[in-house]
Amino acid sequence: MRIQDFKVVYICPDHNEKYHARKVHMDTMLGELGFKDVVHFKSGSENYPRCLAKANIEILTKYMDVPILVLEDDVEFTGVDAFDYADGVDAIYFGLSRCASHPTNEINEGECVVSPFSDTQVRVYNMLGMHAILYVTPKFKRAVIAKFKTPIWHTDIAMSRIQPAFRIVANKIPSFFQSAKFNAPGHDDSCTLFTITTPKPPPSRVFKMPTNLRYV
């Protein structure tokens, strides 16, 4: 399949010159890529992460019964638009992150843990980053909504905590990455612009699958 086969919603507050430039970028990029069904979700001006959490809650609630590709407004396209759509997956990450979430603290912890899923995808268990995700199943959307309604700091850390309870996969080659053009000085594109080759656990610790997670 191709990413253009899905409705896409991108989140952008568009409340000042900086974010208006991002909106223009997203409209231009998605138009050039051939997306036919593009929605701009104008997020609120609350402090992060409440604004992003509320935006995702509203989007996932509205599009509960259809697969929906949600993008953040700081992404660029890598040139890869084809992917494998496997039955039974709850979500597909079209954007990668090298970073893993800490299991209890609001910090990252080394490289993310993945395991083989197919020739083109891996299963993820604690990957940070929410810049390009295809949400597929209602049960996963409901779990994300419930998680984001609780007090949180970083939304991607909150999201990572429920990944082991679902079948969440990531494409080994991303379609989108978070670009230095739209982020603070010192941002390194390679944090989200890379290819997953041989899945292996991070050297810092051995990942233990939580046994008390269950969502329906």
Where are these regions (language model features)?
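An acidic/histidine-cluster motif and surrounding catalytic segment
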Residues: 1-71, 75-216
